[in-house]
Structures are given as C-alpha cells and as structure tokens.
C-alpha cells in the first residue's frame, strides 16, 4: 500500500510539472455574483493562455463547481468553437487540440457553493484564499508558480460597496444590482485574488510617489478611522524608502472584515484585516493595527511581487514582512521598541529550542513562530553582519531582478553574496539551516542597545531586597521607557506595606507613564488601600485595559 501511495504522489507531481511546462496562463477575467441567501456564487470566466507544447488537455483548479457554455477562441484567428470540458471534484479539464505557440481564450459559466474561502458574515461577504484556496470560489490555479493578471467584476445589491484587487474602473447599474469592475496590470498568484462586500465608508490619500491609498471602515465606525489607520502614511513612505523599490502595484486599500480568520491578509493591493483592530483613540493604546498594517503592506513586495516557489522558502514571505514591520515600528516608536520586540521573540524562540522543538527556517513545515520571528531575526543578524549599505542593495537587486516572478532562498543569497564584503556561509548555517535558536548570538546583538543593557541590569535585581535597589527602581519608574517602568512595578508587586516600596508605587502613580501605571493595575498583589486616593485615578487613564483592571480590583 505504501508503494501505491508513493506512486500516486509521484504521478500527481508529474501532472503539476506537465501543466506548467505545456501552458502559460496569462490573464483571467471574471464577473462573479455572490448570493448571500444561498451562500453561493456564480459567474462568467474568460481565461487567456499560451501553449508551450502540444497538448490535448489543460486544466484549472476548481472545487466542486458546475460549468456550462464552454467555448475556445484563438487569439490570432478569432475563430471560436465549442469544446469539451469535464468538471471533476477539484478541477475543470478542457479538451482540445492545443497548438504550441498559439494563444487561446476559453470562456465559460460556472457556479459553486463553497464550503470555505468565501464567507458570508451578516451584511458582509469576503474571501480568504491564503495558500491555495481561491479555487473554492473562482476557477484559478492553486500552483503559485503560474501567475496571471486578474480582472474582477463583482455584482452586488445597489446599497453595497465592493473592494477588490486593482483599480476600480466602473460601477454600472444592473437592475436592482450594480457591477463593480476592477483592473489589474501585473500578474500575481491566484491565492491573492480577493473581494469584500459590505456597508463601507472610504477615506483616501496620495503618497509622495503618487499611489492612492484607500482606507475603509464600516459606516458605523467612521469616527474610528483615524486611530485605526494611525501612522499609515508614515509606514507607507518609510517602507518605500527603506526597501528602495517603489510600491509595485496601482493602488493600495485596507478593509476590516467581520469574523476574519487571521489578523490580516495581504491580498494584492487590498489587505483584509480583522475588525477587532478597529479602535478609538483610547483603544489604540491597548491593541492597535499598526504592526499588522506594516506587516501586510511589506508583503506587497515580499510575497506578492516576489513569490516563493514552494513552502521551503516561506520565510522569504513571512520573515521579510515581519522584519520590515519591525523596522517601520522602530521608525515610529524608536529603537527601544524595536529591541524590545526582538527580545520577546528571542525568548519565545529560545523556549521552543530548549524544549527540543526548534526548527530550521528552510523547513517547509515549520511553525509560524519560526517563519515569522526566526525569519526576522535571521535578517536582523544578516544586516549586522554585512552592513546597512550592502543589505539594502542586496534587497533592492533581489526585488528588481525577480519582480513578478517566483524565487528561492538561493536567489536571495546570490544577491547578498554579490554585494557583501564578508562570507555569509556561517550565517546561512546558523540562521537558515540550524534547528536550534542561536540565543548567544541573539543576546550579544541585543546588548548593542543601551536600553537592553539597562533592562538586563534591572532584571538582575529581582532577588535583591528593596533597600538595595531603591535607586534603580526609582530611575526606571521615572524613565521615558515603557518597559523599564513595568519591570520596576513587577519587582514591587507583593511587597505589601514596605515603606520604600509604597513610596515607589506612589511615585509611579504620580509620575509613571501609561504602561507603568497599567502595570500597577494588572499586578495581583498591590496594597490598593494604602495607595488611595491616587489608585482610583487609574480609572481615568487612556487605556480600557487599565480602567477595567482597576474597576475589578
């Protein structure tokens, strides 16, 4: 039985290889109509392709779809004929005498009732094709190595707004509905095709490079638009400058959707993200969209512009997006924030490694922690090794050379080696191939931060009595740093009515920043009665987390 399975696996691999060798899909135009009542979708498709080798069959991935009115047209002769098409469980196979060097267009109608990927949530409809799932709602290609230009049209009731990939070109009335038409110019893998439907309001701005950025909120959340999208323009401008390659698409849009499965998804030109990140100005201090905002925008270059050939190279998507999001946060919040986040991810990675669960970055089945955080650490360490100038040049050359193509890790490393003045073999072994997290290297890097040195010194005082560390705790509380003050409060928790501890806690309530004060509210063993009346003032802090914790203490 084992050998039968292996044979089937081999044959499946050959079929995929043969498909990419015999046909190059170029463009797919579709007009789709989602039906919220039936939770179904139907549409018309025109897909253009070029035949590379003679074949009698090509296919599109399509899960449990019904098709009709299938026709084949030669682009050169404009002749059209009916052809045979077979709809299988997860594919549509088109049968004809396809000639090499010829371009064809196949048109057909389809309908489906997807069990996943197309979601109906109240008054919203949205898609999530991450990986290879777009074929559940749109005949397309699961293989991300075959990119196409996608132009979508979406038919919805007149009172709804549609957001999809590319530039919205027209909105046409169709009886009780409207057809929203979108245009893309450059190719992308099918998993990044998306649309969202809902009652949305829009605000927009233009970047320095003249890219229009559209920011959507539900009509009921218009007043939350500014805090939700705070720093978006700064992030965009920073990433374009830092990456050194202009934003590679026509538009950029961001859309919150209800009951989203992830924090965010980097659909080309149209990021969808969880409605949980839609906040007011107070909520911004507790949980905000900024990290996800920067991460998904970075994917427009890393993942969308250049796309992995297979999961072995998935860190080229997630590691890069995580790293560049960190750089954007450093630009906004400062270097201390950057090093603090690196430190926290290092702690998680070291814990995983200590448990014997460490993973190599080039393991295609690695966890998100590895792809995202270890990937970001790998880039941080590479940049330290080869220097800013070489690093930025390598990234720029890599993106420009492989724009709108598929890439491997070796493709990136070749560009690094071409500009680096040092040998990177040891870095590759330590950060890409080694399963264990290189904690010693990481902590040596962290110690280049003056803030991290102060933090490590403060942590070393945890077992010391109050009288031996009063001055250090006082300095931490009075510092501008969010994290030193919180560590000081952690060390004071449980000291009860110690005179020096009380003085320090009262100082923190009077002079500490928002997060130092929050640490008091969240600490389980605070002498609340002895800290009154200052303690009750925490109820007015600009943090719902602080207010709620104070209320229930």
Language model: regions and residue ranges:
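Juxtacatalytic substrate-recognition/specificity segment
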Residues: 118, 128, 133-134, 152, ...
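Acidic/His/Gly-enriched intrinsically disordered linker/tail segments
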Residues: 312-380, 384-385, 402, 419, ...
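Extracytoplasmic/secreted proteins, especially bacterial periplasmic and envelope-associated proteins
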Residues: 93, 227-234, 238, 288, ...
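Long hydrophobic segments that form regular secondary structure
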Residues: 366, 375-402, 455, 465-481
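Beta/coil-rich, acidic/histidine-enriched accessory regions frequently appended to metallopeptidases
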Residues: 406-538, 543-553
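Bacterial Sec-dependent N-terminal signal peptides
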Residues: 1-22
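Acidic/His-enriched low-complexity segments
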Residues: 17-247
């Amino acid at each position: 039985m084992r050998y039968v399975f292996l044979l089937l696996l081999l044959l499946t691999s050959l079929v995929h290889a043969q498909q990419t060798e015999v046909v190059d899909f170029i463009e797919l135009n579709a007009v789709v109509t989602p039906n919220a009542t039936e939770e179904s979708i139907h549409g018309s498709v025109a897909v253009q392709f070029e035949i590379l080798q003679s074949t009698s069959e090509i296919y599109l991935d399509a899960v449990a779809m019904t098709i009709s009115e299938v026709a084949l047209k030669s682009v050169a002769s404009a002749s059209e004929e009916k052809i045979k098409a077979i709809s299988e469980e997860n594919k549509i196979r088109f049968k004809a005498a396809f000639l090499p060097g010829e371009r064809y267009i196949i048109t057909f109608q389809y309908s489906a009732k997807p069990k996943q990927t197309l979601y109906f949530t109240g008054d919203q409809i949205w898609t999530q094709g991450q990986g290879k799932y777009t074929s559940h709602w749109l005949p397309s290609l699961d293989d991300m190595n075959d990119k196409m230009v996608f132009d979508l049209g979406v038919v919805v009731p007149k009172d709804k707004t549609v957001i999809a990939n590319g530039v919205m070109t027209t909105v046409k009335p169709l009886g009780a509905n409207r057809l929203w038409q979108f245009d893309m110019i450059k190719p992308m893998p099918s998993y990044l095709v998306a649309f969202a439907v809902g009652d949305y309001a829009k605000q927009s701005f233009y970047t320095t490079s003249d890219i229009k950025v559209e920011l959507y909120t539900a009509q009921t959340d218009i007043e939350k638009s500014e805090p939700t999208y705070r720093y978006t323009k700064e992030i965009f401008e920073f990433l374009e400058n830092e990456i050194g390659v202009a934003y590679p698409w026509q538009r950029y849009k961001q859309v919150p959707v209800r009951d989203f499965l992830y924090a965010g998804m980097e659909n080309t030109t149209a990021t969808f993200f969880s409605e949980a990140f839609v906040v007011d100005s107070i909520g911004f201090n507790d949980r905000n969209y900024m990290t996800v905002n920067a991460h998904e925008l970075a994917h427009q270059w890393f993942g969308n512009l250049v796309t992995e050939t297979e999961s072995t190279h998935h860190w080229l998507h997630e590691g890069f997006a995580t790293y560049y999001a960190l750089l954007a946060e450093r630009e906004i919040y400062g270097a201390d924030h950057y090093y603090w986040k690196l430190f926290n991810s290092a702690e998680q990675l070291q814990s995983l490694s200590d448990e014997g669960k460490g993973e190599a970055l080039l393991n295609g089945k690695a966890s998100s922690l590895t792809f995202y955080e270890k990937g970001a650490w790998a880039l941080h360490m590479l940049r330290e090794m080869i220097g800013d100038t070489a690093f930025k040049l390598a990234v720029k050359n890599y993106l420009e050379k492989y724009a709108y193509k598929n890439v491997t890790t070796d493709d990136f490393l070749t560009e690094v080696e071409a500009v680096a003045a040092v040998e990177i073999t040891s870095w590759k072994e330590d950060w890409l191939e080694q399963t264990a997290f290189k904690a010693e290297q990481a902590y040596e890097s962290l110690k280049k931060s003056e803030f991290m040195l102060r933090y490590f010194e403060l942590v070393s005082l945890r077992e010391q009595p109050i009288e031996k560390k009063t001055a250090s705790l006082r300095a931490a509380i009075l510092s501008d740093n969010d994290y030193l003050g919180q560590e000081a409060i952690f060390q004071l928790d449980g000291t009860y009515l110690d005179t020096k501890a009380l003085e320090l806690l009262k100082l923190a309530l009077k002079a500490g920043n928002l997060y130092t004060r929050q640490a008091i509210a969240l600490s389980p063993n605070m002498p609340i009665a002895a800290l009154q009346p200052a303690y009750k003032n925490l109820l007015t802090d600009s943090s719902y987390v602080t207010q709620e914790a104070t209320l229930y203490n």
